[in-house]
Amino acid sequence: MKRINRRKFIVQAGAAAAATGLPTAPAEAQVGRKLGTCGPPPRKNPTRQTSAEGMPPLPLPAVPLRRSEPKAEPAPPLMIAKLEYGTTQDWNTDPGDIDNLMRHVRSAVGLWYGWKQMPLAELVALYQAKKESKVPALYLSGHEAFQFTPQERAALTQYLLDGGSLLADACCGRSEFANSFRAEVKAMFPRRSLDRLELDHPVFRSFHKYTTVNFRTFKGATRVDTVGPPELYGMNLGCRAAILFSPWDLSCGWDEHSHEHGQRLLPGDAIRLGINLVSYIAALRQVAEVQSVTREVSGKNERKRQQFVLAQLRHHGDWDPDPNSTAQLLRTIASVSSLAVAFDQKPVDAKETDIARFPFLYMTGFRDPRFSGEELGALRRHLQAGGFLFVNNCSGYAAFDRHIRDMVSKLFPDQKLERLGAEHRLFRSFYTLTEGRDRQSGAARPLELEGVRIRDRVVLVYSKNDAVTHLKLVSDPFGNGYDADTCSKLVTNVVSYAMQN
């Protein structure tokens, strides 16, 4: 195959990182290309010169000359592995995409990350040998439809559960790849969904703050440029989006070229969004590793009939994003109070027969819970009959806050959430609380709890700021919430108030 000069390719294509419009790739770059490739090869890694003393083959008294030998730069920490899958070159549609993206990350963020190509068979062999891959992220791209084997699905599933991330891009916006990827995600995680990320998701503010991007599509021979909110899809495991997918082409933009077909982000936006994706994965790496291990908390099985039982509501909005922090909530209650605690958590559906036995209900999540009218009726009757519901906004995102307010308006149409004043009994039920601390800055911040009253009793307490996940001292770095000490005291007071009233 004729070797493509990268500089010539880019000049002829008229590409640049901040470009807003690009013509078709040159014809000579299309000729003789292996199946699946639509971009030039990656640039050669740079070398540096290091001096070394040497004696030239000259008779004395010649002055010794200094000669230099090339030496490669030390390898940066590995961030992404580009997956080799299938039987064609379709996995490598843009050979220079990740290499170029890492250069932009280094330039913009000041952090140098490495990448490598990795056969999917290597990942399968690793997990079949009961080992783990320590690569933070795997990258998948292509044009054509594909299908994983059961062994490949099992390895990828375990990799994600172990704290890894999967980043996927439909090159040129090809629906064949997009549909196959969605089907594979569904096969790996049948009970979870790949949902469009809300604009307040941290991936859109992890480095560059995004509200709109530039899209390019083609209707026949007509080019259509539009501006709109970015479109990324994610699937959560714990408090992070472990799978991130773009149905709009990013890889051609990372590779600094474009084509007059398909659907894509313009290269400038593709590169900036790519920097955000890498920044998000890097920032959530510690959280991913902590949440990959679920800890069981147990205690003496004393006073069983008097034990406090926490029943967690199941719903459609990612109802159990962080099992470790829920277990830590129970551990906190047991360690600071004399309350007998049942450590076996009880997941329950919002059905009258399921929740009737549990006076204290706990709810958290990320997305719209989508309770049915029948489920809302069961919850309403339960709270009117003496039950209690504590709702915590996991990570404190605005999207879940909107959904909870909508849920409460349907649950109690004649009432609304009201801010609990500083004099409310809840803030004195165990600890005397006047203010909290922010988990990011450590600065003082008000305790913002809201509730719904029935007569003189608050039956529903809602914290729009995360009051639970930082109990384990590691939480979403982009989250909005209280520090560990405030979380501990606040949840203790909520439980104490519920038990006393």
Question: Which residues does each PLM region occupy?
Answer:
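Surface-exposed patches in mature extracellular/periplasmic domains of secreted proteins
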Residues: 112-121, 169-171, 192-198, 288-293, ...
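Extracytoplasmic/secreted envelope proteins and their assembly/folding machinery
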Residues: 95-102, 153, 157, 178-182, ...
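Sec/Tat signal peptide C-region and signal peptidase I cleavage site
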Residues: 25-28
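Aromatic-Pro/Gly-enriched surface loop or interdomain linker
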Residues: 30-137, 141-144, 250-251, 257-360, ...
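An acidic, glycine-rich "communication" segment
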Residues: 76, 177-257, 264-275, 306-309, ...
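Loop/turn elements at helix/coil->beta-strand transitions in domains of secreted/extracellular proteins
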Residues: 78, 133-136, 162-165, 239-241, ...
